């Protein structure tokens, strides 16, 4: 299987998992959940989660065991895009050919949706029972560093 085929296969797996992990848009608070889904399910190649899965397989693990972590990486990425698109940052109107979250839902809901995605990412990491607890803590620590001022924000 070539790279593009492998990426497409993994992308489908990630899309299905994200659909399961994201809260339904009808559950309270519906507008925030709608904005989360709009931003996450709005396209993208899912390269980051695919790399997480490939990395696990490269060291003898399974892609399935790291699927929650792979999705968490994607949620952190989308959170950063939502915040980056805001008027106070880059003030982008479009992302992946669609109106940005703040253009559809307003700035306040977009900020809350991004915050909720970041929180959900850490929830997925914390709830993953596939590995040893001490390894889970290391993953959470690395994700926090990567999403904070020593990573994305810095």
Residue map of PLM features:
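N-terminal amphipathic/basic leader segments beginning at the initiator methionine
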Residues: 1-22
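Mg2+-dependent prenyl diphosphate-binding active-site environment of isoprenoid biosynthetic enzymes
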Residues: 9, 22-154
């Amino acid at each position: 299987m070539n790279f593009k085929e492998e990426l497409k296969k993994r992308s489908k797996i990630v899309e299905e998992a994200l659909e399961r992990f994201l809260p339904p848009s009808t559950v309270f608070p519906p507008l925030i959940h709608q904005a989360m889904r709009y931003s996450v399910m709005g396209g993208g190649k899912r390269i980051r989660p695919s790399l997480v899965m490939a990395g696990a397989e490269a060291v003898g693990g399974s892609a399935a065991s790291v699927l929650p972590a792979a999705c968490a990486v994607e949620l952190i990425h989308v959170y950063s895009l939502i915040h980056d698109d805001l008027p106070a940052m880059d003030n982008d109107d479009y992302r992946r050919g669609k109106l940005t979250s703040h253009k559809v839902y307003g700035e306040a809901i977009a900020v809350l949706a991004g915050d909720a995605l970041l929180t959900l990412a850490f929830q997925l990491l914390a709830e993953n029972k596939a590995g040893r607890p001490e390894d889970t803590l290391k993953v959470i620590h690395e994700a926090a560093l990567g999403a904070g001022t020593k990573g994305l924000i810095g």
